[in-house]
Structures are given as C-alpha cells and as structure tokens.
C-alpha cells in the first residue's frame, strides 16, 4: 500500500459542479451541473477495491452529496473550530457531542 488514507478536497464537486456562463458578470448566474461521482467511485472501487478516502464535506452539502459519501462508505470531516464560531451552538454538527462515528475530526483547516 502506498498510502494509509487520502483526503479528497471539495468532495461535493463529485456530485455536482457550479457552472457559470462565460458571459455572466457574477457567479450568481451559475447553475449546478450533475457530476458522475457515483459512477466514478464505483468504477475505481471495481478496479482497486475499497478506497481509503476521507471526504472533505464542508461548505454547501446537499442531501445528494451526503448520500454519495454515505453510499460509498467514506467518512466525512468535522472541524472543532467551526463548532465554537457558530451563533447557534446548540444545533451545529461540529460540536463534539454531535459528531457521527463515521467522521474524522480536525482542530482546524488550512483555510482558517
């Protein structure tokens, strides 16, 4: 084995990507375009076996992105710093007592 585990950044892009028309003045004119994530991960697993992947599931995570992660058995990410930066501390999924077993917990990321 060459690696123990790989963190896939911007995992949500495997479900859909934000497409912005070339003539648009701002990104607000974009639309979500489906991506072939499910087919891709099935084919890679078929060829390589189980994948040692952590899905970076931060940002705009839709039920479809969550389903893609769960259906392929990839753990997601929790960031402790996000838990204590929320105005609604009682419901944030980043608080330690709300973490799910299939999660990898980081104190922070390169972005914060």
Model segments located where?
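Catalytic cores of glycan-processing enzymes that make or break glycosidic bonds
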Residues: 1-112
